[in-house]
Amino acid sequence: MPIHQVTANLMPLIWPEAAPLLQKAIDLDPSAITIEQVEYGIRRGEYSLLVWEEPDAGITGAVTVSFQDYPMHRVAHVHLLGGKGVVKKHVFEEAMQWMRMHGATKAQCWCQDNLVPMYEKMGMTNTHKVMRIEL
């Protein structure tokens, strides 16, 4: 079950399958981003789009990732994650290997409290709380 990075030239072929998977993640907080903004960010290179396939099932999952450089770390930030099998160890291991190949030393994501258990199953730990105020 390989993970593939989707390059801009493959977007017309892959996006119709990946978009509904990512939309499920967007639906958890529709005020944060739209699927059109995600597509634009991928095409501009702000986010990388990864998809994974299952034999005889085709594309079953998608994730968007960006990289943030800090003095001590290069962080792979997962923005959206959707589809089947996202908590399977081999899926997460392959995604982490891709992140390492791109220089990341840590991976992170922001999520609502109800998703913390899912990410903990993947081996992630809850390290911060994000506080926000409207300006």
Functional labels for PLM-detected ranges:
Residues 44-86:
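Conserved donor-binding loop and adjoining core beta-sheet/short helix segment
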Residues 73-122:
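Acyl-donor binding region in acyl/amide transferases
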Residues 20-25, 35-36, 50-54, 79-80, ...:
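N-terminal start-of-chain detector that recognizes signal peptides
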Residues 110, 125-135:
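Conserved catalytic-core motifs of GNAT/GCN5-like acyltransferases
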Residues 47, 121-125:
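Short glycine-aromatic motifs
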Residues 28-47:
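Active-site rim helix/loop that mediates acceptor-substrate recognition in acyltransferases
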Residues 1-33:
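Short amphipathic alpha-helix that is part of the acyltransferase structural core
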Residues 39-40, 66-69, 97:
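Short, flexible, glycine/charge-rich loop motifs used to bind or transfer phosphoryl groups or to couple energy/partner
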